[in-house]
Amino acid sequence: MSRGKTIRPSYYDEEESSQDELSHTLSKGRSNIGSQSDDEEMSKISFGALNRAQSKLNKHNQKHKTQEDNYKSSEEEFFDSDSDSDGPPEETSSKDTKKKKNKHAPSESSSKRPVSRIRDIPGLPSRKQQTLHTDIRFDAAYGKADLAKARKDYAFLDEYRKQEIANMESLLKDKKSKLNDDEREEIKLQLQSLKSRMDTLKNRDLENNILSNYKKQQMESFKEGKVNKPYFLKRSDKRKILQKAKFDSMKPKQREKAMERKRKKRLGKEFRQLEFKPTNR
């Protein structure tokens, strides 16, 4: 009995046949697109062969497209770099100019600035000159000014003011000084303003001293246990205490003048209240 030959399937042969079939269909598909025979042959091909054919076609199309793009870009570069052309250079768009060459490169901005609507008139101070020299000590942006601290820091100016007052008084008393009437009036006004300023500063210092002493007494009595809570003065109480302290510090003549001013002020107020007002009938 003769032993039968066992034939095994060869995968290599199948792959070769499928590759041949694929190349045959591709070449035929490029030449005869849309024919009926092509459709019949495509229906007989396996799905794996069709998939491989599709991927090959995609690769071929992509390669062809990149070659065309490279050719176009090289043509554009050639025509752009041609320096023999007589025509004006083409203006690049704003989008191209805004693009940075490198991400770490500094950003570019236009040097063109719009013209100011406010025209500078010769003879009038401009806004820039007005705000050029500003004293930050008196700027509202830095908060409210501390008058007590400013007075303490600039207390040495009182000596200069006193000396200036003495010089002005001696100049006015000197009969040999060749001053006309206008200059004398101007010096008198300056002297009066300086004296009034010195008086206001003295009164302010007196008020601050009285109020600070009162606060110290209240805090000491609170620490000793004499008072349960420190009492803070109202405006009316402050006014009374300050008036009493001012009257005590005044000279007799100054006190009489102050009393006379108060009396006249009160009388004027009473007369205004008793004025006859005609009624419209």
Curated annotation (Swiss-Prot):
<keyword id="KW-0690">Ribosome biogenesis</keyword>
<keyword id="KW-0698">rRNA processing</keyword>
<dbReference type="GO" id="GO:0030686">
    <property type="term" value="C:90S preribosome"/>
</dbReference>
<feature type="coiled-coil region">
    <location>
        <begin position="48"/>
        <end position="78"/>
    </location>
</feature>
<comment type="subunit">
    <text>Associates with 90S and pre-40S pre-ribosomal particles.</text>
</comment>
<keyword id="KW-0175">Coiled coil</keyword>
<feature type="compositionally biased region" description="Basic and acidic residues">
    <location>
        <begin position="245"/>
        <end position="259"/>
    </location>
</feature>
<feature type="region of interest" description="Disordered">
    <location>
        <begin position="243"/>
        <end position="281"/>
    </location>
</feature>
<comment type="function">
    <text>Component of the 90S pre-ribosome involved in the maturation of rRNAs. Required for early cleavages of the pre-RNAs in the 40S ribosomal subunit maturation pathway.</text>
</comment>
<dbReference type="GO" id="GO:0005730">
    <property type="term" value="C:nucleolus"/>
</dbReference>
<dbReference type="GO" id="GO:0000462">
    <property type="term" value="P:maturation of SSU-rRNA from tricistronic rRNA transcript (SSU-rRNA, 5.8S rRNA, LSU-rRNA)"/>
</dbReference>
<dbReference type="Pfam" id="PF06102">
    <property type="entry name" value="RRP36"/>
</dbReference>
<feature type="compositionally biased region" description="Basic and acidic residues">
    <location>
        <begin position="65"/>
        <end position="75"/>
    </location>
</feature>
<dbReference type="InterPro" id="IPR009292">
    <property type="entry name" value="RRP36"/>
</dbReference>
<feature type="compositionally biased region" description="Acidic residues">
    <location>
        <begin position="76"/>
        <end position="89"/>
    </location>
</feature>
<feature type="compositionally biased region" description="Polar residues">
    <location>
        <begin position="24"/>
        <end position="36"/>
    </location>
</feature>
<keyword id="KW-0687">Ribonucleoprotein</keyword>
<protein>
    <recommendedName>
        <fullName>rRNA biogenesis protein RRP36</fullName>
    </recommendedName>
</protein>
<feature type="region of interest" description="Disordered">
    <location>
        <begin position="1"/>
        <end position="135"/>
    </location>
</feature>
<dbReference type="GO" id="GO:0032040">
    <property type="term" value="C:small-subunit processome"/>
</dbReference>
<keyword id="KW-0539">Nucleus</keyword>
<feature type="coiled-coil region">
    <location>
        <begin position="161"/>
        <end position="205"/>
    </location>
</feature>
<comment type="similarity">
    <text>Belongs to the RRP36 family.</text>
</comment>
